[in-house]
Structures are given as structure tokens and as C-alpha cells.
Design a protein with these regions (language model features):
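Short coil/turn segments at alpha/beta junctions that flank glycine-rich nucleotide-binding fingerprints
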Residues: 91, 108-111
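Active-site acidic-Proline motif in GNAT/NAT acetyltransferases
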Residues: 85-87, 91, 120
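Short acidic/glycine-enriched loop/turn segments that link adjacent beta-strands
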Residues: 121-122, 140-144
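Conserved acetyl-CoA-binding loop of GNAT-fold acetyltransferases
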Residues: 128-138
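Conserved beta-strand-loop-alpha-helix junction that forms the acyl-donor binding cleft
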Residues: 114-125
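Acetyl-CoA-dependent GNAT
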Residues: 2-4, 8-80, 85, 104, ...
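Conserved acetyl-CoA-binding loop-helix of GNAT-fold acetyltransferases
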Residues: 90-103, 126-130
């Protein structure tokens, strides 16, 4: 997909991002159990949320968290959510989301970015592996931790 760009989350784009139609079944993998447990420990000032736009249409959403002092290493530079509209999947939107979050992590002086996902076969593990993430551990809740060196 050509001409992808990021925009900060706004009232208008948030509604569109929340209305993205995913491939059936993907909504089950949007928020790993680990993130559900640690969400309250995040400093919202360190959260980076962007919509991904193609033309004038929101086709994706990415949220990451950057806090080099967080007590959980896998949450210091973490992709929190990558959502891509079903109609835009397989067209580079997810890759763009990860690359954009990686660039933001670098701007914070971080040398890696992590993602946490359910290890279920239908989860996003293959997607992250194709982008260069390697399995680097399992959370206390049984989710897979993947790390990408920047």
C-alpha cells in the first residue's frame, strides 16, 4: 500500500481506529493477558498512539510504550497494539506500524523493541517473526515475548 502516513490519535481518528474491521478471530489476540495485567502500571505520558492512514482512510492503529525505567524489561520499549483493517492486511500496513514504532523507540535512545503475544497458532507470532523478532522469553502469564534489535 502506497502513501501510508501516521497521525496522532484525535477524537475523529480514534472513532475510526476503534471501528476497524479485523479478520474474524483476530480480536481475540489484540490484548495479550500480560498487557491486561500491566496496563495500570504504565505511565500514560510514555504511551505513543498513532493511526495509520492511506489516502483519507484509517487502515491501522499502532500503540507503543517507551519507558526505559519500567520494572518489567519486556515493557520498557513495547509494541502494545498493532491493528490493521482486514481490507488492508497483506499490504505492508503492519510492517509500516512496526517500523514507525521502532523509529520512535530509537528516538528515545532504546536499542530494542518487544512485542508480547498469545502463543496460540492463530496469533500474530508468525507476523512478528517475519519482521525479525526472535522469541526471547515467556511472561508469567504464558504469553510469548519477542524482541527486535534496533
Amino acid at each position: 500500500m502506497d502513501n501510508l502516513r501516521l497521525e496522532e490519535l484525535s477524537a475523529a481518528t480514534a472513532q475510526q481506529a476503534n471501528s476497524l474491521e479485523l479478520v474474524p478471530g483476530q480480536e481475540a489476540f489484540e490484548t495479550p493477558v500480560t498487557y491486561e495485567h500491566y496496563e495500570s502500571s504504565l505511565n500514560l505520558a510514555n504511551t505513543w498512539s498513532r493511526v495509520i492512514i492511506a489516502g483519507d482512510e484509517v487502515v491501522g492503529f499502532v500503540r507503543a510504550h517507551f519507558d526505559a525505567t519500567h520494572d518489567q524489561p519486556e515493557l520498557r520499549s513495547a509494541l502494545w497494539r498493532v491493528s490493521v483493517a482486514a481490507s488492508a492486511q497483506g499490504q505492508g500496513v503492519g510492517r509500516f506500524a512496526v517500523a514507525s514504532a521502532s523509529d520512535e523507540a530509537r528516538s528515545h535512545g532504546l536499542s530494542e523493541i518487544t512485542a508480547v503475544w498469545s502463543s496460540d497458532d492463530k496469533g500474530p507470532g508468525d507476523f512478528f517473526h517475519k519482521l525479525g523478532f526472535h522469541d526471547s522469553g515467556i511472561t508469567e502469564y504464558g504469553d510469548q515475548i519477542g524482541t527486535l534489535a534496533l
